[in-house]
Amino acid sequence: MQVSFACTEQTLRSRTSEDRLCPSRPSGGQNGVSMAQTKQRTPPMGAKNHNQVLPLLSHILRESTVKSTGMKYRNLGKSGLRVSCLGLGTWVTFGSQISDEVAENLMTVAYEHGVNLFDTAEVYAAGRAERTLGKILKKKEWRRSSYVVTTKIYWGGQAETERGLSRKHIIEGLRGSLERLQLDYVDIVFANRMDPNSPMEEIVRAMTFVINQGMAMYWGTSRWSAMEIMEAYSVARQFNLIPPVCEQAEYHLFQREKVETQLPELYHKIGVGSMTWSPLACGLITGKYTDTVPEKSRASFKGYHWLKEKAISQEGKKQHSKVKELHPIADRLNCTVTQLAIAWCLRSEGVSSVLLGVSNIEQLLENLGAIQVLPHLTPQLVTEIDQILGNKPNLKKDSRA
């Protein structure tokens, strides 16, 4: 069975908001633009049933596929919330790198292709990312029950009381986010890194409060260590409060240890899932920084000198060499290295969703094509990739790191 990722202006206009994210009747397909036609290569689907779930995931994440879009959905950790395995992030892009018109087009195409998860933060573009996201959601008039919005709280302003994870800032910061988003609630509010100045009990109580007040459905952590997450869970259980359901963590071919050795243990013990970001290592895996830093690329932006240095460093050059070695595998699967890298992230135990960062429709469609690659990542192929990378973590590492 082959799933066509078709998207044209006509199909976008013809489908009502009630149809989106719901199975639709097949069309003639004459006006559709398939993934293959947008230059992106996808693997032959005849080899395996597209709905077949990898054995690695079948006993871990309950996964389903909507035939009309090909999108896969998973539970967020062991909660009941169903999220698309690919989500759309807004870091760097919304309110900054791209225009509001481009942002709207990206959200529309993503939503039409089954993406139901949109991630942002109060700090992104000094709040403009939330404003842009909220403005688009209001304009599109999609059913609020059909999508998931997540935001992150920590850096809200310059005043001492406008940042961190104090009860004051968690509550006031989330209220500010809701105002910018023009929403009554967010589905998940994340603590955007740990705050050493705020007691854990205060953080958990504040998160429980905003959930009980209807300002959020769930709460999670971002850039927290496994020990910190376990402490939050223990505090929640001790005082009959609400524990976190998810950790946002960086995860890609060259950043593996936390997601592969620490978070799976938390998933099995306390049900905390993983929502991962930067699957392409801020573009390093795409090959755009092989020789120089292109204009208008992320590494050329003000404040991203660290990325430029990383791209041209000796370590960056070694990583480029590893990526080149992955090309034959991608060729065998009839996909791009970008699609292979994203599918590789999706195959990891306990990963509920991978957040995408894109600045144009072509990138988005290519990234979405990773879903078709996922069923073809056999244990043998994963082992072959591990041998090329040479960085498979020791599964017995101390989870306190």
UniProtKB/Swiss-Prot annotation:
Ligand binding (NADP(+)): 90-91, 97, 119, 192, 222-223, 248, 277-282, 288, 298, 357, 359, 363, 366-367
Subunit structure: Forms heteromultimeric complex with alpha subunits. Identified in potassium channel complexes containing KCNA1 and KCNA2.
Database matches in InterPro entries: K_chnl_volt-dep_bsu_KCNAB, K_chnl_volt-dep_bsu_KCNAB-rel, K_chnl_volt-dep_bsu_KCNAB3, NADP_OxRdtase_dom, NADP_OxRdtase_dom_sf
Role, per record: Regulatory subunit of the voltage-gated potassium (Kv) channels composed of pore-forming and potassium-conducting alpha subunits and of regulatory beta subunit. The beta-3/KCNAB3 subunit may mediate closure of potassium channels. Increases and accelerates inactivation of Kv1.1/KCNA1 and Kv2.2/KCNA2 subunit-containing channels. May display nicotinamide adenine dinucleotide phosphate (NADPH)-dependent aldoketoreductase activity. The binding of oxidized and reduced NADP(H) cofactors may be required for the regulation of potassium channel activity.
Bias (Polar residues): 1-14, 32-41
Active site: 124
Entry keywords, A to Z: Cytoplasm, Ion channel, Ion transport, NADP, Oxidoreductase, Potassium, Potassium transport, Transport, Voltage-gated channel
Source species, domain of life: Eukaryota
Protein EC: 1.1.1.-
Highest classification ranks of the organism: Eukaryota, Metazoa, Chordata, Craniata, Vertebrata
Localization per Swiss-Prot or TrEMBL: Cytoplasm
GO biological process: regulation of potassium ion transmembrane transport
A GO CC annotation given for this chain: voltage-gated potassium channel complex
UniProt record similarity statement: Belongs to the shaker potassium channel beta subunit family.
Primary subcellular site in the record, as a coarse category: cytoplasm
Positions of the UniProt region annotated as Disordered: 1-49
UniProt name for this protein: Voltage-gated potassium channel subunit beta-3
GO function term, MF aspect, one: transmembrane transporter binding
Transmembrane stretches, start-end: none
